[in-house]
């Protein structure tokens, strides 16, 4: 995690198609490791990922990595 002008940036590594949703921290990648159920097709995995993070943090957007397993999310300050 690192601070941004109007929020916080979160580095995430996503593993789609998992049996259950889980979180861990990957020290080597310096990223939150997230396993999600949705497949990486037609944006389904991105929608599930954003939905999970929005439940936890509120307003969240995908900054980079739309078609990659390595993503950067931005949590906005209120």
Swiss-Prot record:
Which protein family is named in the record?
Belongs to the UPF0235 family.
The protein's matches in SMART domains, at most eight in alphabetical order, are given as: DUF167 (SM01152)
Enumerate the Pfam families for this protein: DUF167
Quote the InterPro entries the UniProt record gives: DUF167, YggU-like_sf
What name appears for this protein in its UniProt entry? UPF0235 protein AF_2072
| Record-linked PANTHER family | UPF0235 PROTEIN C15ORF40
Q: Which residues form the signal peptide?
A: none
**Which terms in the GO cellular component ontology are assigned?**
cytoplasm
Task: Write down the species.
Answer: Archaeoglobus fulgidus (strain ATCC 49558 / DSM 4304 / JCM 9628 / NBRC 100126 / VC-16)
């Amino acid at each position: 995690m690192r601070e941004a002008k109007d929020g916080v940036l979160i580095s995430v590594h996503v593993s789609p198609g998992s049996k259950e949703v889980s979180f861990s921290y990957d020290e080597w990648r310096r990223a939150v490791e997230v396993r999600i159920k949705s497949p990486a097709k037609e944006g389904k995995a991105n929608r599930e990922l954003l939905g999970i993070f929005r439940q936890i943090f509120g307003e969240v957007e995908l900054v980079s990595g739309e078609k990659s397993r390595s993503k950067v999310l931005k949590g906005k300050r209120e």
